Amino acid sequence: NVFLADELNRATSRTQSALLEAMEEGQVTVDGETHPLPKPFMVIAAQNPYGSSGTQLLPDSQMDRFMVRLTMGYPAPESELELLRRKQACNPLDNITPVADQSTLAAIQHEVADTYASDDIFKYIVRLTTATRSHPDLRQGASPRASVALASMSRAVAWVQGRDYVIPSDVQFIFADTVAHRLLLTRQAEQEQKNARDICTAILQKTPAPRVK
């Protein structure tokens, strides 16, 4: 149910194409025969820094299929120290236990999907994504798929917070993580060392949020 793609930006184009089919259509094709993937199904991918040996930029179409993109960075010194201590005592993987099974995850997905988002929230989402399409520092803005993903992620944030309805702060919290990796900067913006996350922050600041009723 979970496919982990390590060093995705070192994969061959044929591998990229196969993964795209799995993510978009929920199936894989082997020797001309199509096989449906189990549900739920999700992909978690890791990338090496662009410019490292053998890396390449992922196609825009594939980046658009990933719902969110997170940058891990380096661990805090305290976390790194704890990592060393755990590795010395035993293999941390030996102590991993499941926290949910397939049916539990499916039930959570249904609950998240049932989380209410008002028409005002939908209009807010569309205003945000539309703003990326006319931004002077972007040559490619967020696609309609980004709007759908932002609505889904906003529902998930609301559910985690214990609510059965979405409020504007849910959208704001997840906006950059959901949208930034789908944006393409202009050459001038790249030369000025601007980045997509900062542009998302600026768009949030300039776009009026609906009032919570």
Indicate where each model-derived feature is located:
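Alpha-helix N-cap and coil->helix boundary residues
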Residues: 58, 79, 116, 120, ...
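Hydrophobic positions in the central parallel beta-sheet of the AAA+
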Residues: 3-4
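Conserved AAA+ ATPase small/helical "lid" subdomain
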Residues: 95-150
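Canonical AAA+ ATPase core
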Residues: 7-18, 23-100, 105-115, 155-160
